[in-house]
Amino acid sequence: NAFFTGLGKGRKIALFDTLINQLEEEELEAVLAHEIGHYKLKHVPKMIIWSFCLTLAGLYLLDLIAKQAGFVEAFGFSSEGYGFGPPFILFILLSSNITFWLTPLSSYWSRKFEYQADKFAATVIGSNLPMVTALRKLNEKNLSNLTPHPLYSGFHYDHPSLIERESALQK
């Protein structure tokens, strides 16, 4: 596996030893170029902004819920004297049910960034072949599903499937 992380002076690219051991040099260069693409295309700050927007939307939703007559009483709380506490506790408890339905939006952005980083790597390397062969090896080693159902993929995959990535690289 490989990933890019960090902001400012704390930026890092991690390449796992298992990745280094299973790929050829040109494939490693493509993977490294892919991770550099995440940096150059500012994917980490964009995802932080996206997460911040989701948090704001969640807090706005909390405000709307907290103002609904009978909401806190429906869960056994008194509406008098507790202020914002019960709605906040309920929001924390119920938020995973809400954010689950937003997962496809986050997955969409993540997959979009993966396509962009793949394209960046192919452009920098001058060929899409090293990236394609690296992806094939990684998918084989990880026993990845080549054709996940789109609905399942939307909720559970933050990276496109091998077939989707290869197809995008061929364009």
What role is predicted for each listed range?
Residues 92-104:
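Hydrophobic alpha-helical transmembrane segments of polytopic membrane proteins
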Residues 79-93:
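Hydrophobic alpha-helical transmembrane segments
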